[in-house]
């Protein structure tokens, strides 16, 4: 213990005994007087000098210990060495003295401000008073004046760069500017971090008991004797419990009754009665929804005129169609309160408990029953399933094909400027005719008496006699063409008819029909005397009909609505189908009028085909849709098939079997079963049965044309890969 510590605290002197005759004590015995500043008052006054410190006394070895002659050697008086007033005031010694310690230098309180002498008291006590407390002398400490209005507060907020770090101290009533360390502390606390920047919460843990076997034990204290000797206190407790059980003072616990506190009131009720009550429940009919006449701004036709209003007022309330007069208001906030609200609520209550209710039996329909039951494809045979033959010979795209009425011969036109005739059964190319340009369309005359093929080449339509089959039919065809007698008066026609001569005639060419524009399509009438051509142009002469026997041409339309894509003759009736980009128009050629306009719901029609019965039509489009039209049913598609992934190029019906096919740029031919019934009340049955693949995609083109065999369930397809394929 340091010297002088007990002296400062005012306790008794308990220093170690020192020799009586030390140098300092010897000076007292010799009669040497003490220092003037060491008076008796300073020794035993019991007061501490605020100007001195115990630490100075410990470091200063000039302090003296005085032994009272009347005391024992253990009671030693410690007398600190003091300087005189004159010595303390001298400027020479002022530099040697330590600096005067400030009042709050060693103050460790961080909750109270140095300027706040009020203390740590609730400031709510002085909330309504002009002062915030009292100082040490008992005088009031008035609150600082805060005369800033909102404008000055706003200007201070805009101009003072330290406004964001200024806070109001409730204890002193002043604004305090936070230091950087305090701002950093606030930010860390807001983020949920520790206030001390140097504190590391993730210090490496020191596991005292490690996995390593220690040589010496952690604690080597011998076990207590009580750890292996039975406890006498527990023995006494057990004996008391045994005695109490024998005497019957302690009873065993009764088993808890698991019966539920709350029970079901209707547990024993007859279930049939419950079901009957539920079955008899008839829900109340719902209120009808308000109509346009109940709007605050109804349409003009719902507002009554003056005559209608007078007639409504004269009618009895039971005879009125509306129980109110429709009114119009400019805005919703101008609508007044509804005067008939309570009356309508009362009538609704009367209806709920007075009116009898009727039960409507609800029919539960299985959703799967609504789906039509389609037959299996194997029950719909025959239809083509496998690829039987490939006709090779063309060097470019095979754009069009056509089959003879007998089904023995096949003709194809290609971009290599050639027309080839094939034998269907053997795949042999019987004849090849080279023309001036690419063949866009080709059609075999459906009349079995005439052996004639029409092909579109650039701006011309050429009629070819292939000379295949019966020679009598071939010669009769030539006589039919050469026996033409021109009329006496020449009629101006939109085309020019020219006969082939020389080498062209020997190769099979018979007639040239030259047009003013490029020809896109040619198609024959069922009788074989008329054929129509399509000129893809925006003019009025997009469609022309030619008559072979009289060599006459005419434009059936004065004006074409839209760009014509395909045309087709009805197989039995005088109807003419004209397909534009989005519509299919049906014209009656005898009456010269528009009969129907079919809405395809497609972006661009590419091809059409008519059912042999003539009442149904299929339409293919470039947006991968195939639409089936039942013309007796509606002008909209009966069914739209989206089986192909790319644009459809051609569609075709079989003449005798219930089959139709479609060819697409995805190099596939899809064959579907399309049964049309004689019963007008029964819808057609459409079932996809087979996807035929074999063509290769060339220049983003796949199958370009599809044609059925006239008598067999076979289908021909021509593709961009230069081949013709037969599927049987």
From Swiss-Prot:
The keyword Methyltransferase does not apply. WD repeats lie at residues 393-432, 434-474, 514-556, 559-597, 600-639, 643-682, 698-728. One of its GO terms (biological process) is regulation of cell cycle. Pfam families: BOP1NT (PF08145), WD40 (PF00400). Residues 50-67 have a biased composition (Acidic residues). Keywords: Nucleus, Repeat, Ribosome biogenesis, rRNA processing, WD repeat. GO terms for cellular component: nucleoplasm; PeBoW complex; preribosome, large subunit precursor. The keyword rRNA processing applies. Residues 1-114 are annotated as: Disordered. It is found in: Nucleus, Nucleolus; Nucleus, Nucleoplasm. One of its GO terms (molecular function) is ribonucleoprotein complex binding. PANTHER family: RIBOSOME BIOGENESIS PROTEIN BOP1, RIBOSOME BIOGENESIS PROTEIN BOP1 BLOCK OF PROLIFERATION 1 PROTEIN. Component of the PeBoW complex, composed of bop1, pes1 and wdr12. The complex is held together by bop1, which interacts with pes1 via its N-terminal domain and with wdr12 via a high-affinity interaction between the seven-bladed beta-propeller domains of the 2 proteins. The PeBoW complex associates with the 66S pre-ribosome. HAMAP family: BOP1. Belongs to the WD repeat BOP1/ERB1 family. Component of the PeBoW complex, which is required for maturation of 28S and 5.8S ribosomal RNAs and formation of the 60S ribosome. This is Ribosome biogenesis protein bop1-B. The gene is bop1-b.
């Amino acid at each position: 213990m340091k010297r002088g510590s007990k002296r400062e605290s005012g306790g008794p002197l308990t220093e170690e005994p020192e020799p009586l005759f030390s140098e300092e004590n010897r000076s007292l015995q010799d009669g040497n007087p003490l220092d003037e500043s060491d008076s008796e008052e300073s020794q035993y006054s019991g007061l501490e000098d605020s100007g001195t410190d115990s630490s100075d006394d410990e470091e200063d070895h000039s302090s003296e210990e005085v032994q009272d002659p009347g005391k024992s050697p253990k009671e030693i008086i410690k007398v600190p060495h003091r300087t005189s007033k004159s010595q303390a005031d001298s400027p020479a010694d002022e530099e040697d003295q330590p600096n005067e310690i400030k009042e709050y230098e060693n103050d460790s309180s961080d909750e109270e401000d140095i300027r706040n002498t009020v203390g740590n008291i609730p400031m709510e006590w002085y909330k309504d008073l002009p002062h915030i407390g009292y100082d040490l002398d008992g005088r009031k400490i008035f609150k600082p004046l805060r005369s800033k209005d909102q404008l000055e507060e706003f200007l201070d907020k805009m101009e003072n760069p330290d406004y964001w770090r200024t806070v109001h101290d409730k204890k002193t009533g002043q604004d305090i500017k936070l230091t950087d360390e305090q701002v950093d502390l606030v930010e860390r606390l807001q983020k949920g971090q520790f206030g001390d920047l140097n504190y590391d919460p993730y210090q490496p843990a020191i596991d005292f008991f490690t996995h390593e076997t220690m040589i010496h034990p952690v604690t080597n204290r011998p076990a207590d004797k009580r750890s292996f000797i039975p406890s006498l206190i527990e023995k006494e407790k057990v004996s008391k419990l045994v005695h109490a059980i024998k005497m019957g003072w302690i009873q065993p616990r009764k088993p808890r009754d698991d019966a539920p506190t709350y029970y079901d009131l209707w547990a024993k009720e007859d279930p049939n009665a419950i079901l009957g009550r539920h079955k008899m429940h008839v829900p109340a009919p719902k209120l009808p929804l308000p109509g346009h006449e109940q709007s605050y701004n109804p349409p003009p036709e719902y507002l009554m005129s003056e005559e209608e209003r007078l007639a409504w007022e004269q009618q009895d309330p039971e005879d009125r169609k509306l129980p109110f007069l429709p009114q119009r208001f400019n805005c919703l906030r101008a609508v007044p309160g509804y005067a008939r609200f309570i009356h309508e609520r009362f009538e609704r209550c009367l209806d709920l408990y007075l009116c009898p209710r009727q039960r409507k039996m609800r029919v539960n329909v299985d959703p799967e029953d609504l789906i039509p039951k389609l037959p299996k494809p194997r029950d719909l045979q025959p239809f083509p399933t496998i690829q039987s033959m490939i006709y090779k010979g063309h060097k470019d795209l095979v754009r069009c094909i056509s089959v003879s009425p007998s089904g023995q011969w096949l003709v194809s036109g290609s971009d290599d400027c050639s027309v080839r005739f094939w034998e269907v059964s053997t795949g042999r190319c019987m004849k090849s005719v080279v023309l001036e340009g690419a063949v866009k369309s080709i059609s075999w005359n459906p009349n079995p008496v005439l052996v004639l093929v029409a092909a579109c080449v650039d701006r011309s339509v050429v009629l070819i006699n292939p000379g295949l089959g019966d020679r009598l039919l071939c010669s009769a065809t030539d006589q039919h063409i050469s026996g033409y007698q021109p009329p006496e008066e020449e009629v101006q026609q939109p085309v020019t008819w020219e006969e082939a001569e020389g080498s062209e005639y020997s190769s099979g060419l018979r007639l040239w029909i030259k047009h003013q524009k490029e020809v896109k399509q040619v198609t024959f009438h069922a009788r074989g005397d008329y054929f129509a051509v399509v000129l893809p142009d925006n003019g009025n002469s997009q469609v022309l009909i030619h008559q072979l026997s009289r060599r006459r041409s005419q434009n059936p339309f004065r004006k074409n609505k839209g760009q014509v894509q395909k045309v087709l003759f009805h197989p039995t009736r005088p109807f003419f189908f004209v397909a534009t980009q989005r519509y299919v128009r049906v014209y009656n050629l005898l009456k010269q009028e528009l009969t129907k306009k079919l809405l395809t719901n497609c972006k661009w029609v590419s091809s059409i085909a008519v059912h042999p019965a003539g009442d149904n039509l299929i339409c293919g489009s470039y947006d991968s849709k195939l639409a089936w039209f039942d013309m007796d049913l509606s002008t909209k598609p009966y069914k739209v098939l989206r089986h192909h992934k790319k644009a459809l190029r051609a569609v075709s019906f079989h003449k005798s079997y219930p089959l139709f096919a479609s060819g697409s740029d995805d190099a596939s031919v899809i064959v579907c079963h399309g049964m049309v019934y004689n019963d007008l009340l029964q819808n057609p049955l459409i079932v996809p049965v087979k996807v035929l693949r074999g063509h290769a995609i060339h220049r983003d083109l796949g199958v370009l044309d599809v044609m059925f065999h006239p008598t067999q369930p076979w289908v021909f397809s021509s593709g961009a890969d230069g081949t013709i394929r037969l599927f049987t």
